[in-house]
Regions:
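Residues immediately N-terminal to the Walker A/P-loop in ABC ATPase nucleotide-binding domains
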Residues: 31
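Conserved glycine(s) of the Walker
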Residues: 45
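Hydrophobic anchor at the beta1->P-loop junction of P-loop NTPases
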Residues: 38
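Conserved inter-motif catalytic segment of the P-loop NTP-binding fold
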Residues: 6, 21, 25-26, 42, ...
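Hydrophobic positions on the alpha1 helix immediately C-terminal to the Walker A/P-loop
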Residues: 49, 53
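Walker A (P-loop) ATP-phosphate-binding motif of ABC ATPase nucleotide-binding domains
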Residues: 35
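Gly/Ala-rich phosphate-binding loop of Rossmann-like dinucleotide-binding domains
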Residues: 58
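Charged, amphipathic alpha-helical linker segments immediately N-terminal to NTP-binding catalytic cores
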Residues: 1-9
């Protein structure tokens, strides 16, 4: 690594960059351990598609292109738009999910043991801790993504800073 003291830049030569292999949950579509965003207009079916993919992962089924899910596992959902009882669980069941492999973040426990509203902009380390202790977790589904963004949604730096932990 070369450090340019004048500009305080940390620069690395490409020859020193270690190549890492990408592992795929769904080949060429969903990389494991990476942020993937389903984008589209409101009401176009992003949540339904995400739940269909999650269902495939819980049972080791086939993805929309016919390829088999080789990395079946568990799903963690954080949703601020859809109710688990009347929307999420019924859709997961309709898609054939093994609902015993799906969990949803509903609250956080405070220091004094009381349940409080989960605030992803402050409580994301709790998700990280959960993920590190859940070796079979294959997908963290956040819906909508703006629910984890703090600051001004119109400022790229605020959005990027909020999404960095993901």
């Amino acid at each position: 690594m070369v450090i340019n003291a004048k500009e305080n830049l940390h620069i690395m030569k490409m020859e020193d960059v270690q190549i890492n292999r990408i592992f795929w949950l769904w080949k060429y579509w969903l990389p494991l351990g990476k942020l993937t965003i389903l984008a589209g207009a409101a009401g176009c079916g992003k949540t339904n598609l995400a739940l269909a993919l999650a269902s495939t992962i819980t049972v080791g089924g086939n993805f929309p292109d016919g390829t088999h899910c080789e990395h079946l596992g568990e799903i963690l959902i954080y949703s601020t738009e859809d109710d688990p009882a009347d929307t999420l669980k019924p859709r997961l069941i309709a898609h054939g999910a093994d609902i015993s492999k799906v969990a949803i973040i509903t609250a956080r426990r405070s220091e004094d043991g009381k349940l409080e509203a989960f605030d992803p902009t402050k409580d994301f380390p709790k998700i990280e801790e959960y993920i590190q202790n859940a070796p079979n977790l294959k997908l963290l589904l956040i819906d909508p993504i703006v629910s984890v963004v703090s600051g001004d949604l119109n400022k790229a730096t605020d959005v990027r800073r909020s999404l960095q932990p993901l």
